[in-house]
């Protein structure tokens, strides 16, 4: 039977799910309708749509996982539930993270200005660079799935033992393997994080250089390019902040689950972990002028609809 803490956990998980679905469904529908109307799909719209779809899938897996954790935690000890849920969670999380990373790199190439020949060469082949990164992410996903299979097998073997402390004292080999596999899974997250951090640093350098050139030419320090730099930096910084919270929450959740099992601490750490897919879509909407204008029009129509008087009954 669900306790009060379980009910609070499930309520917060459902709230996160609804918030995330509202933002990502809006992004997907807005970009699809725009593409159908214009008969053309731009690179940024394609990345945003794929990101919205992968995040929706991730949110659905999270919702199912939260209900299992809150209502039937004993199922985590069975291979029938823990393996498909864990693999699906990692797959959708991997795709969401890498698509968000590619979006940050796209904004960097689109907005930053450097005279260096390597930057100009990469910028000219921006779509190809994004395609190569997505292909690399798929190879890393295959590697992740193989490591994850071994991680799940060892975890289930440890859970099957009646006395975990005695088992670890008798043989350190399973624990050492678990630590090694968890480290490998964690290291893969550093690649998209490093790419986003590099994009942010170069965007900042480009902004400083652009502002200095404007001051030297006596044109002031604010123009359309400066504002574009700042908007892009805010988006990448927001993504990095959410990604840091997401990454450290994942590490804490992994350790608490491996050491303490599926307890109340693990459940509430997972809520912080799920803030990334829930909130990131609204950062994207606020940072994209087209999506922001569409959202404002939608809210205006909803406001007028709610204020419209009801017809008198016959």
Swiss-Prot record:
InterPro entries per record: TAS2R
Membrane topology: Multi-pass membrane protein
Keyword entries, A-Z: G-protein coupled receptor, Glycoprotein, Membrane, Receptor, Sensory transduction, Taste, Transducer, Transmembrane, Transmembrane helix
GO cellular component: plasma membrane
MF term (GO), any: G protein-coupled receptor activity
Subcellular location: Membrane
SUPFAM superfamilies hit by this protein: Family A G protein-coupled receptor-like (SSF81321)
Cytoplasmic side: 29-50, 123-127, 209-238, 287-314
Extracellular face of the membrane: 1-7, 72-101, 149-187, 260-265
Additional free-text comment from the UniProt record: Most taste cells may be activated by a limited number of bitter compounds; individual taste cells can discriminate among bitter stimuli.
Role this protein plays: Receptor that may play a role in the perception of bitterness and is gustducin-linked. May play a role in sensing the chemical composition of the gastrointestinal content. The activity of this receptor may stimulate alpha gustducin, mediate PLC-beta-2 activation and lead to the gating of TRPM5.
Family: Belongs to the G-protein coupled receptor T2R family.
Protein name per the record: Taste receptor type 2 member 42
Lineage: Eukaryota, Metazoa, Chordata, Craniata, Vertebrata
Gene: TAS2R42
């Amino acid at each position: 039977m669900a306790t009060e803490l379980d009910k609070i956990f499930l309520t917060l998980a459902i709230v996160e799910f609804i918030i995330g679905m509202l933002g990502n469904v809006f992004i997907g529908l807005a970009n699809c309708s725009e593409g159908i109307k214009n008969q053309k799909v731009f690179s940024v719209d394609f990345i945003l749509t794929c990101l919205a779809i992968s995040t929706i899938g991730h949110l659905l897996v999270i919702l199912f996982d939260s209900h299992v954790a809150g209502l039937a935690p004993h199922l985590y000890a069975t291979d029938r539930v823990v393996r498909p849920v864990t693999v699906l969670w990692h797959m959708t999380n991997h795709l969401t993270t890498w698509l968000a990373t590619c979006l940050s790199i796209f904004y960097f190439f689109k907005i930053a200005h450097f005279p260096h020949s390597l930057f100009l060469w990469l910028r000219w082949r921006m779509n190809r660079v994004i395609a190569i990164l997505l292909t690399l992410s798929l190879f890393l996903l295959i590697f992740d799935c193989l490591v994850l299979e071994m991680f799940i097998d060892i975890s289930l073997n440890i859970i099957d033992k009646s006395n975990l402390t005695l088992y670890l004292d008798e043989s350190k080999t399973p624990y050492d393997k678990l630590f090694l596999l968890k480290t490998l899974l964690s290291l893969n997250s550093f690649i998209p994080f490093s790419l986003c951090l590099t994009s942010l640093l170069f965007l900042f350098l480009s902004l400083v250089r652009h502002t200095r050139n404007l001051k030297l030419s006596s044109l002031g320090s604010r123009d359309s390019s400066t504002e574009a730099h700042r908007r892009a930096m805010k988006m990448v910084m927001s993504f990095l902040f959410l990604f840091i919270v997401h990454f450290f929450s994942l590490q804490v959740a992994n350790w608490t689950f491996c050491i303490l099992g599926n307890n109340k601490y693990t459940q509430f750490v997972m809520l912080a972990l799920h803030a990334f897919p829930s909130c990131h879509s609204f950062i994207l909407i606020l940072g994209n002028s087209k999506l922001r204008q569409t959202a404002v029009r939608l809210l205006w129509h909803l406001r007028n609809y709610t204020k419209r008087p009801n017809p008198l009954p016959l």
